[in-house]
Amino acid sequence: MNYATITYYAIANGPCGRTSVFVSGCRHRCPGCFNSVAWDFAYGQPFDKATRNQVFASCQPDYIAGLSLLGGEPFEPENQRELLPFVRNFKALYPNKTVWCYSGYTWEQLTGKEPCAARCEVTDELLQLLDVLVDGEFVQAKHDISLRFRGSSNQRLLDVPRTLAAGQPVWWEDEKVFATHTMEGN
C-alpha cells in the first residue's frame, strides 16, 4: 500500500490534534474530491515499517488524541489488508487514543447489508477497531463548509462501538460547545 501524505498535528480530521494518514487508491472518484491525486493506487510512497513507526511515534504525546485514516479510500480491499495490522498495533500501543476513518462506502455497504465490492475477509475486524467512521461519498451538490469533520451533508459521523452494540447506525456525539456551532455568528 502507498500513502499520498501524512499530516501531523492535524485538527480537521477529528477532534483535537491527530495524525492523519492519507492512503493512495480510490475507485469512487467523487467529483469535487479535495484529494483526487490520491485516487491512483501507485501514487505516493510505500507505507513501510519506518513510516508506520514514525506515525506511531507522532501519536505518543498526550496532546495527540489519535489517528485518522483518509484517502484515497482506506476501505479499498488492498488498503484494508495493509491497514488492519497497522491499526491493530496502534490500538495495542495507544488503547486510550481514538481511530477515525473516512470512507466513501457507507456503513451498510461495509457491513454487507448492501452490495459492496470493497467488503473482504478483513472488513469486519477493521471496522471493530475504529472509534468513528465518517461514511458516504463526497457529494459536491451537498458540500457544506459549516459541517464539522465532513465535507457534504450526506456523510455521517458514526460512533462505531455504539453502532455495533445497537445493530444500527448511531451518530457520534460532538462536545456540546461544538454541537451547537453554526457559521451564522449566533
Residue ranges with predicted function:
Residues 6-8, 53-55, 119-121:
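A generic local structural motif
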